[in-house]
């Protein structure tokens, strides 16, 4: 067993002898180097912690209580010749041995009867357990316990020792026990029969006075004054102990040393051949020597109630019958003496063994605690299911060793199924709420914990209620073994967080694991984060309950509903911060990698060293050899992780009738080398070579290639219950597999072979899952069909296959365990690709057309950046092939550049797939690029390639030189086809939706018109502006381009009463324009200023008034969505896709949405808002479209305008409404809705089919081809199930942006912004898997362009990239030097005049806003001036061109600035300062109203504005 325990210690741990412990706590762990990286849309920041310490803490105090129990006998050590061939005691052989003893002269049968009774009770474990306890009590006796000391403290609440151990007293370990001594008596050789209940042991030589004292105390009652774990209470083992010692016994001396205890143990074990008893005792003490110091306040619940330590009844007849002990001892393990020998040589190793054992136990108990009681393996069954060989009691060391086996993934063998030792699972199994007493340290404590008292004061004692036991320890010694997301114990990891600008710096997590990972990495980086649990309302922080760089949210199970909100503005960098987070923007990617591990221990915050020689561990091979021998012994107990295996038979029946009427079918061959999926009306329908209506035959040159076997079969994909072919929505069964009958033995792919037997319905193993199917005989094939209802969340691999089939995105084979289609595709073109690489060349003409709307500032990569600058270049290999195909495709430079850049960016494996696709289609085509991008999503996670690199291939076209079909647009809005749901039904479902939201505490923003309009200069958006009213038209016409927006018009207008707008006719006028997107164009409908203003004010922040499962507004971010989806990880992902959703809404449906909203929230609105909302409701009756390019105007009979203020709101509400009407709430356990996006988790494929059918019945139009069923869980453009969140994003989109800006983007005005944009785009494509070697040269050329554009030297740009933010650079934790980069205006008289003109134009809006601020912030009204507010607001209309210049300062000042960055981030009242800091004349005075001390610091700084920005 010592070999097993040694193997629990990590390789970097090199234990030595002589450990001196003098403190009740020891912190153990490892130092490692952690390289960390943070990326967002603003750039990349890196940092390294060369000496990071990951640790747990253990204490020598614990709440244990020993009880005497009957346990099985340990027979090792008795003479081997009294056992029969089965390993059982034979009383006949016992009698024969006794009859030969010189001590037994008469009445041998009677002695044999006594011996039989005693031998079957033989167990010395408890005696050795107490002696081991005495050894360490003596050795480390100076350890002190103080009842008023803190057991646990996190800054919010603490738990005192006296609260956990109410009856304890201050004491040292040794003084905590005043042990009586049991009677130790010399065995009388003339004793006729054994004395009842008095054990008798053997002893070599004379029992010394110290040994007598040790034995007497070891047999006595332990009644401690202090709760030291090894000194826990235990009853008296025996009132009297006989010792058969030839040389006699000395009277007790009353004193001894720990070395005396070691000598006594050695003598006692060897004399009684009790090595196995000692091993059990050693394991018991390893269980109780130390206890965890919990990682959370709730984890203290594990230790509130005393843990029971089962101590076997002391029973030994060796002293009575020495003849049965000393001759050729029986033992079940050849290594039975190793544990004693190892302990004698290295007694301090028990401490490490104890730490390793309890860590494995509590880590795995953390997992067991989260398992549902209804699961096959749960907290009640995990031990008995892991035991192989015989039943056992679920208690003691068996349970702990089971947990060790589960944690380390190994098999552990024991010679006896003993039940002695500590049973840790009592707290887990009692299933009741546990109350943990705490002392309040922070009055906000109830926000973090489920406290009984909600209003508390500092120092008050209260109680935390715990229902779900969290882990008490984290993996440290077992770090990196069987890693899990839950424990964040990966050597390298990453997490991605979406932060859209609308989120206002708030990240919402719906996945407890992702949330924990985020909090952990932030902690590693040195950032304190506080989050709010949106389900319970409580707060959690990554610094209070956790340490060592890891955070674990433990209040709920994974399956439970979770949601966590993190306000990124409150993230606080610590004094030691390695990667600080400033103004997160867009997608945040946090990652780390750990290397260079070194063990470390601390006691009283000082290093704890072991001196002396290295420990020589027993060879692992010896342990394994012994384990192999044990496996052949019936009486040996084996523990291993439980696994179910089952063998089932295949079967088949016949196909009744095949009617090909609009259904899909597959053409299959018995050889199984090709699958062709087709749709049509009959078998005689013709097709183009290699192409079908639902897909393409990958790698098949012509139809004859299907006949690799002797015959091909037309096999329906879908059948009904009568075996009649149907389309997918009308069928009940779907094809999943076919086997050729010629193969009499069928291999399921997992090493199990089965013979086909001909049963119509049966179970089969398919894709590693057990599936119930019906088999249909079709020629020489057995086709296996599964009922939709039988494809469940317990067969997720099959669900992915069926989902791909239903979506017409089939990329799998059916026959005889085919390869996946992509592997086959790559293999089919292997020779062709090799020839192209080695031989193919192409003369490429570099003169290409410019994209019609491309301006100079849009292009970031040009052809001359990729190839030599000449008219014709000779290309080779894949680039030559792509050039040839591009020339056939189009002649647009931006398209060519994007494809070439994408090819260079692709990793080698995915590059082979892309080139094979190009060869398969013999060129590039908009249609296949789009369809293959869609199919790649369905294949993600089911094939060996990272298909995310092929998502949305069509965006690589990067510019389409075409126009919107405006006539078609007009037809679609005049001859409408909307969903057929009544006004009453829409009202009912939407009221239901908003009532749920209100129950969650969601509310609209309440505001009077005067407040709203006075803030117009800052709250109006900056989008394009239109108006049908002459007053606004005149204003818009004369405004300069920079302020020709809603914000600009509103700011220019004077104060207006609400009736200025409400007196107008309710109507919506939309003005069309063309939006140029990657690979396509679409129509935009920008709506008029009046309808926008009324809608925005009347339904203010309406996007935040949906329930939690509708993440819009501030909740529409990746983190919140992941948290919501966390509860669906065990369900089948189902991404429903609406087809052209805007065009499906009737006017009545849209009006019903507003009516429902007003009816639910009317009491939370002002009268002004209700009036505006009703005006907006009525405006839907009259919708008018203007087409400026044709001059045509027409009335719109329905549908939704894409550019209206309420577009997302309406789409989201009606999204839910239509599907609620289709039964989504009964068919789907959980779903998420946002705009036209839907994500759901379904239990069976049948539920998803029913939802599609029910929705279609009311006229809802869906695009099944874009539905991802069973594979990726895509919602809001992020795959929620991707292991690598960054990899789940789209490389194609990143490359398109890297090469060409969005066409609506403006020319760059500042050098800093341009370089930052280049850096962000570069970092993003690298994060998405682009080749750094191929992309870096292009990135350097972009930086060169920036340098030339702004006429600066090379080192200016280089320093911007590498220097720290404190020095004016773009790098967090970048290089620090005396140089500082400063942004300065490029002198330009035109920009100066334009700025002055804008300031004058917006003066009315600024004046109203200034008055608003003075009214609402009266305490600092004197500091608010119109002039500074004008300057602040004018910055929104940036017209000044800026460059970067060098300046110099003292190096220490730079380091000081970086060191104090964000030091005041948690400053109270900071929100007020942030809101008005740019609009006050005396910033120090403002701060003095909030914090005089900080104001004094600013006053002395010399530059208050700068230092306030640095410090906050």
Swiss-Prot record:
It catalyses: RNA(n) + a ribonucleoside 5'-triphosphate = RNA(n+1) + diphosphate. InterPro entries: DNA/RNA_pol_sf (IPR043502), Major_coat_LA-virus (IPR015302), Major_coat_LA-virus_sf (IPR036332), RNA-dir_pol_luteovirus (IPR001795). Keywords: Hydrolase, Nucleotide-binding, Nucleotidyltransferase, RNA-binding, RNA-directed RNA polymerase, Transferase, Viral RNA replication. One of its GO terms (molecular function) is RNA binding. The keyword Hydrolase applies. Pfam families: LA-virus_coat, RdRP_4. It comes from the Viruses. GO terms for biological process: DNA-templated transcription; viral translational frameshifting. It is an enzyme of class 2 (transferase). Its EC number is 2.7.7.48. One molecule or two of Gag capsid protein is replaced in the virion by Gag-Pol because the fusion protein is essential for RNA encapsidation and replication. RNA-dependent RNA polymerase which replicates the viral genome. Catalyzes the transcription of fully conservative plus-strand genomic RNAs that are extruded from the virion into the cytoplasm where they function as mRNAs for translation of viral proteins and also as substrates for encapsidation to form new virions. Once encapsidated, the positive strand is converted to dsRNA by the RNA-directed RNA polymerase. Belongs to the totiviridae RNA-directed RNA polymerase family. This is Probable RNA-directed RNA polymerase. It comes from Saccharomyces cerevisiae virus L-BC (ScV-L-BC).
């Amino acid at each position: 067993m010592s070999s097993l325990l040694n193997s629990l210690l990590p390789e970097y741990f090199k234990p030595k002898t002589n450990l001196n412990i003098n403190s009740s706590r020891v912190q153990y762990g490892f130092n490692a180097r952690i390289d960390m990286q943070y990326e967002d849309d603003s750039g990349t920041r890196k940092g390294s912690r060369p000496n990071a310490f990951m640790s747990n803490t253990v204490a020598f105090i614990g709440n244990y209580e020993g009880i005497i129990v009957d346990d099985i006998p340990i027979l090792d050590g008795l003479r081997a010749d009294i056992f029969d061939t089965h390993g059982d005691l034979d009383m006949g052989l016992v009698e024969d041995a006794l009859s030969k003893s010189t001590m037994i002269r008469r009445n041998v049968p009677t002695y044999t009867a006594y011996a039989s009774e005693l031998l079957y009770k033989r167990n010395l474990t408890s005696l050795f357990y107490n002696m081991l306890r005495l050894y360490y009590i003596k050795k480390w006796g100076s350890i002190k316990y103080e009842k008023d000391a803190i057991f646990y403290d996190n800054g919010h609440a603490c738990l005192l020792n006296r609260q956990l151990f109410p009856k304890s007293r201050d004491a040292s370990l040794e003084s905590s026990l005043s042990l009586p001594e049991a009677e130790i008596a010399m065995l009388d050789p003339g004793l006729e029969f054994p004395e009842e209940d008095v054990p008798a042991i053997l002893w070599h030589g004379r029992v010394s006075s110290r040994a007598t004292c040790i034995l007497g105390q070891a047999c006595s009652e332990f009644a401690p004054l202090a709760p030291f774990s090894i000194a826990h209470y235990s009853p008296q083992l025996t009132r009297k102990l006989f010792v058969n010692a030839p040389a006699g016994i000395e009277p007790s001396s009353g004193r001894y040393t720990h070395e005396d205890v070691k000598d006594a143990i050695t003598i006692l074990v060897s004399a009684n051949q009790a090595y196995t008893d000692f091993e059990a005792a050693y394991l018991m003490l390893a269980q109780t020597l130390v206890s965890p110091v919990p990682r959370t306040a709730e984890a203290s619940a594990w230790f509130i109630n005393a843990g029971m330590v089962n101590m076997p009844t002391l029973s030994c007849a060796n002293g009575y019958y020495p003849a049965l002990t000393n001759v050729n001892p029986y033992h079940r393990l050849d290594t039975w003496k190793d544990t004693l020998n190892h302990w004698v040589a290295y007694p301090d190793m028990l401490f490490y063994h104890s730490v390793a054992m309890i860590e494995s136990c509590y880590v795995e108990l953390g997992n067991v605690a989260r398992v549902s009681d209804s699961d096959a393996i749960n907290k009640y069954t995990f031990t008995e299911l892991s035991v192989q060989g015989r039943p056992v009691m679920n208690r003691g060391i068996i349970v702990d060793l089971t947990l060790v086996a589960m944690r380390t993934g190994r098999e552990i063998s024991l010679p006896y199924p003993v039940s002695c030792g500590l049973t840790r699972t009592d707290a887990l199994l009692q299933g009741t709420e546990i109350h943990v007493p705490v002392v309040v340290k922070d009055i906000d404590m109830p926000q973090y914990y489920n406290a009984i008292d909600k209003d508390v004061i500092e120092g008050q004692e209260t109680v935390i209620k715990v229902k779900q036991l969290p882990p008490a320890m984290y993996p440290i010694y077992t770090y990196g073994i069987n890693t899990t997301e839950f424990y964040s114990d990966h050597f390298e990891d990453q997490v991605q967080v979406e932060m859209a600008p609308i989120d206002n710096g708030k990240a919402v997590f719906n996945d407890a694991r992702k949330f924990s990972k985020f909090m952990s990495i932030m902690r590693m980086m040195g950032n304190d984060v506080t989050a709010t649990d949106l389900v319970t309302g409580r707060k959690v922080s990554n610094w209070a309950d956790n340490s060592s760089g890891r955070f674990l949210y433990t209040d709920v199970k994974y399956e439970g509903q979770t949601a966590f909100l993190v306000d990124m503005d409150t993230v606080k960098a610590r004094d030691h911060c390695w990667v600080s987070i400033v103004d997160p923007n867009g997608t945040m990617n946090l990652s780390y990698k750990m290397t260079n591990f070194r063990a470390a221990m601390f006691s009283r915050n000082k290093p704890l060293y072991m001196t002396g020689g290295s420990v020589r561990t027993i060879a692992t091979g010896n342990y394994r050899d012994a384990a192999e021998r044990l496996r052949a012994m019936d009486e040996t107990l084996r523990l291993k992780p439980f696994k179910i295996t089952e063998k089932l038979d295949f079967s088949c029946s016949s196909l009744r009738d095949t009617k090909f009427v609009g259904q899909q079918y597959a053409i299959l061959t018995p050889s199984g080398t090709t699958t062709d999926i087709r749709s049509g009306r009959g078998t005689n329908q013709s097709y183009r070579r290699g192409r079908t209506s639902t897909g393409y035959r990958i790698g098949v040159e012509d139809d004859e290639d299907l006949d690799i076997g002797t015959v091909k079969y037309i096999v329906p994909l879908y059948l009904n219950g009568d075996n009649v072919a149907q389309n997918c929505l009308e069928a009940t069964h779907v094809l999943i597999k076919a086997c050729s009958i010629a193969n009499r033995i069928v291999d399921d792919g997992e090493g199990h072979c089965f013979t086909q037997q001909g049963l119509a319905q049966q179970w089969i193993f398919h894709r590693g899952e057990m599936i119930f199917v019906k088999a249909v005989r079709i020629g020489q094939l057995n086709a296996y069909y599964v009922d939709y209802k039988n494809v469940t969340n317990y067969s997720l691999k099959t669900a992915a296959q069926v989902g791909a089939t239903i979506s017409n995105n089939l990329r799998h084979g059916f026959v005889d365990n085919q390869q996946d289609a992509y592997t086959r595709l790559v293999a089919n073109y292997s020779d062709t690709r090799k020839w192209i690489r080695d031989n193919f060349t192409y003369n490429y003409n570099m003169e290409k057309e410019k994209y019609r709307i491309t301006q100079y500032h849009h292009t970031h990569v040009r052809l001359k950046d990729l190839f030599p600058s000449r008219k014709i270049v000779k290309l080779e290999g894949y680039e030559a092939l792509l050039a040839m195909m591009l020339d056939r495709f189009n002649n647009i430079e931006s398209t060519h550049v994007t494809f070439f850049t994408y090819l260079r960016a692709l990793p080698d494996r995915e590059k082979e797939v892309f080139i094979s696709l190009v060869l398969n289609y013999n060129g590039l085509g908009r249609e296949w690029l789009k369809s293959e991008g869609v199919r790649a999503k369905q294949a993600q996670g089911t094939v060996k390639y990272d298909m995310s690199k092929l998502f949305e291939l069509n965006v690589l076209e990067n510019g389409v030189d075409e126009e919107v079909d405006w006539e078609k647009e007009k037809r679609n809005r005049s001859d409408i086809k909307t969903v057929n749901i009544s006004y009453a039904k829409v009202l009912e479902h939407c009221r239901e939706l908003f009532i749920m939201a209100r129950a969650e505490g969601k509310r609209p923003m309440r505001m009077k018109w005067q407040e709203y309009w006075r803030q117009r200069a800052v709250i109006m958006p900056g989008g394009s502006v239109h108006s049908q009213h002459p007053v606004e038209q005149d204003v818009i016409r004369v405004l300069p381009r920079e302020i020709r927006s809603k914000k600009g018009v509103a700011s220019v207008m004077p104060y207006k009463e609400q009736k200025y707008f409400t007196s107008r006719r309710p109507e919506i006028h939309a003005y069309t324009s063309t939006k140029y997107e990657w690979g396509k164009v679409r129509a935009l409908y920008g709506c008029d200023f009046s309808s926008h203003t009324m809608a925005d004010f009347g339904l203010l922040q309406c996007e935040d008034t949906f329930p939690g499962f509708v993440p819009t507004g501030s909740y529409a971010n990746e983190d919140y969505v992941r948290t919501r989806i966390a509860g669906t990880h065990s369900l089948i992902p189902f991404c429903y896709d609406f087809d052209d959703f805007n065009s499906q809404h009737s006017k009545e449906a849209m009006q019903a949405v507003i009516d429902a909203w007003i009816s639910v929230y009317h009491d939370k609105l002002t009268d002004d808002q209700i009036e505006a909302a009703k005006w907006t409701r009525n405006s839907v009756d009259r919708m008018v479209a203007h087409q400026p390019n044709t001059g045509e105007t027409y009335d719109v009979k329905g549908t939704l305008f894409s550019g209206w203020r309420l577009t997302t709101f309406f789409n989201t509400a009606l999204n839910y409404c239509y599907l609620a009407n289709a039964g989504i709430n009964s068919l789907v356990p959980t779903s998420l809705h946002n705009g036209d996006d839907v994500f759901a988790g379904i239990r069976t494929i049948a539920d998803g089919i029913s939802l599609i059918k029910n929705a279609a019945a009311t006229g809802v139009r869906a695009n099944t081809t874009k539905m991802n069923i069973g594979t990726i869980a895509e919602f809001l453009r992020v795959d929620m199930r991707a292991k690598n969140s960054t990899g789940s994003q789209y490389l194609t989109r990143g490359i398109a942006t890297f090469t060409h800006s969005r066409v609506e983007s403006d020319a760059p005005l500042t050098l800093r912004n341009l370089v930052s944009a280049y850096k962000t785009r570069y970092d993003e494509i690298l994060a998405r898997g682009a080749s750094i070697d191929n992309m870096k040269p292009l990135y350097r050329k972009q930086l060169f362009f920036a340098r030339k554009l702004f006429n600066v030297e090379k080192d200016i740009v280089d320093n911007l990239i590498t220097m720290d933010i404190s020095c004016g650079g773009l790098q967090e934790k970048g290089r620090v030097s005396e140089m500082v980069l400063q942004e300065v205006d490029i002198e330009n008289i035109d920009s100066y005049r334009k700025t002055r003109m804008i300031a004058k134009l917006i003066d009315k809006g600024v004046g109203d806003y200034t008055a608003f601020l003075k009214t609402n912030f009266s305490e600092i009204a004197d500091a608010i001036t119109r002039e500074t507010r004008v300057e602040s607001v004018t910055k929104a209309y940036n017209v000044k061109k800026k460059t970067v210049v060098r300046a110099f300062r003292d190096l220490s000042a730079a380091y000081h600035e970086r060191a104090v960055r964000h030091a005041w981030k948690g400053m109270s009242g900071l929100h007020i300062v942030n809101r008005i800091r740019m609009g006050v004349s005396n910033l120090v005075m403002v701060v003095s109203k909030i914090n005089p001390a900080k104001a004094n610091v600013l006053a002395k700084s010399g530059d208050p504005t700068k230092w306030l920005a640095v410090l906050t």
